[in-house]
């Protein structure tokens, strides 16, 4: 009784907070984009004229939206008549979904003669009572999926009220988040997900603690499937690389990829030492954020180092030479850079920032060096059936600090790598036991749609 009373009090104040917040959110620089849909207007109004939603998949932002697309790949032709609603909270997420929808429809028509499943795209509504009730009334979903880390109280409450099955897929939860939810888990009493697919045993335990009435099981991360598919494409692709024209054939290249601002000072000192010792090598720096391009160039110049922007190489039809330092100020080139570099450090990992996608380096045939702060990628280290993790397989080099990274990089020979294909083959063998759960889980969920 006490927990139910607390729950009612929570939802009263939670709803009131949304009422106060919505006028401010309407003026918010990021959230005013698609505001009509965020209050279940706009494109949501068209949902009433469509058949009920078979499957509603919610992805917070761009990263999760790619997971939505991975799930869509495993919709069988027996579900050609289903209606799928894909939502996201950000402009980036919606752009990923829009592009992915077009690719999905094209691929479906090339593969099957049956009509393509209807896919609707909308911004995810604010989790206030009025907006979410309206969204459920219009969509009438049979099955709902939350991806990764999201738990929305009104959304979950309405899943139960409307008898919509709720699954949490690729579920993750940090220790900090778990401790916070432990204190208020009574909020979710009676609104538990029907099944939770967690990407680590620890995540499974965390979710089971918060939702004791839910079925919680382990799954291999969806990203293993997407990485495996990308690896196959990379290995089958033509050898042409648009960046080759700016890479001198005999110059060793050290690549610092997705470097974050919090790592700059320490890496600046390392790059200065590397430049002084590695006289036959070039150094290429790819900042994670565009605002840091000019800052990197300025900081290096203040050290007395001569620096080029990558765009200058292309404009002047020049190649990287030994002793060059290049700040890469072009977008969309990182994959091709991995394929051409000889040594790589992947950033976001020397400070507690969670890490950046080091698996992508392996896809293009180069062993990544990282720091130890990789908490966003812990799922890549939890192996089943005695499989060794990437570090144990010598497919990842971990460094506790910048000093260790410097010692390693300074000791490496100035040689062009000839191992890209062999590394890809080793990575493919490592990935093979970890793939397949995306298809299996999608099949299990869609069984409930029949």
Where are these regions (language model features)?
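A transmembrane-helix-recognition feature enriched in membrane-embedded lipid enzymes
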Residues: 1-38
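Active-site and donor-binding regions of nucleotide-sugar-utilizing enzymes
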Residues: 26, 30-42, 48-238, 255, ...
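Donor-nucleotide binding loops and adjacent catalytic segments primarily
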Residues: 83-90, 94-97, 254, 262-333
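Short acidic alpha-helix that forms the nucleotide-activated donor recognition element
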Residues: 130-139, 315-323, 332-342, 363
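Short acidic active-site motifs
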Residues: 131, 155, 292, 329, ...
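Hydrophobic beta-strand scaffold residues
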Residues: 164-167, 307, 368
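Catalytic binding pocket for nucleotide-activated donors in carbohydrate/polymer assembly enzymes
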Residues: 193, 334, 339-430
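C-terminal alpha-helical cap of glycosyltransferases
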Residues: 433-450
């Amino acid at each position: 009784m006490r927990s139910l009373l607390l729950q009612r009090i929570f939802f009263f104040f939670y709803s009131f907070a949304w009422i106060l917040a919505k006028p401010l959110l309407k003026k918010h620089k990021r959230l005013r984009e698609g505001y009509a849909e965020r209050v279940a207007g706009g494109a949501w109004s068209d949902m009433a004229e469509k058949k009920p939603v078979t499957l509603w998949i919610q992805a917070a932002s761009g990263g999760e939206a790619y997971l939505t697309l991975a799930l869509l790949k495993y919709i069988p032709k027996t579900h050609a008549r289903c209606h799928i609603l894909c939502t996201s909270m950000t402009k980036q997420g919606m752009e990923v979904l829009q592009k992915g929808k077009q690719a999905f429809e094209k691929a479906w028509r090339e593969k099957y003669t049956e009509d393509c499943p209807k896919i609707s795209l909308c911004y995810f509504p604010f989790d206030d009572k009025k907006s979410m009730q309206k969204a459920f009334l219009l969509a009438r979903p049979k099955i709902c999926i939350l991806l990764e880390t999201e738990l929305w109280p009104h959304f979950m409450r309405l899943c139960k009220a409307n008898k919509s099955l709720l699954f949490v897929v690729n579920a993750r939860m940090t220790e900090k988040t778990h401790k916070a939810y432990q204190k208020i888990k009574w909020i979710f009493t009676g609104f538990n997900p029907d099944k939770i697919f967690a990407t680590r045993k620890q995540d499974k335990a965390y979710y089971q603690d918060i939702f004791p009435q839910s079925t919680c099981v382990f799954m291999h991360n969806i990203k293993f499937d997407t990485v495996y598919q990308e690896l196959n494409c990379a290995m089958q692709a033509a050898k042409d690389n648009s960046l080759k024209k700016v890479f001198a054939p005999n110059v060793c290249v050290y690549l610092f990829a997705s470097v974050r601002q919090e790592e700059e000072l320490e890496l600046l000192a390392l790059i200065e030492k590397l430049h002084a010792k590695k006289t036959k090598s070039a150094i290429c720096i790819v900042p994670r954020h565009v605002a840091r391009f000019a800052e990197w160039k300025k900081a290096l110049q203040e050290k007395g180092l001569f620096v080029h922007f990558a765009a200058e190489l292309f404009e002047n039809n020049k190649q990287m030479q030994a002793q060059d330092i290049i700040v890469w100020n072009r977008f969309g080139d990182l994959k091709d850079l991995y394929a051409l570099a000889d040594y790589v450090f992947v950033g976001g990992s020397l400070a507690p920032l969670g890490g950046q996608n080091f698996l992508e380096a392996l896809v293009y045939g180069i062993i990544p060096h990282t720091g130890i702060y990789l908490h966003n990628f812990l799922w890549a280290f939890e192996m089943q059936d005695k499989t060794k993790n990437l570090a144990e397989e010598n497919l990842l080099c971990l460094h506790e600090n910048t000093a260790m990274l410097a010692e390693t990089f300074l000791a490496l020979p100035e040689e062009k790598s000839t191992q890209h294909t062999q590394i890809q083959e080793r990575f493919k063998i490592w990935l093979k036991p970890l793939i397949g759960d995306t298809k299996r889980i999608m099949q299990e969920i869609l069984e409930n749609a029949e």
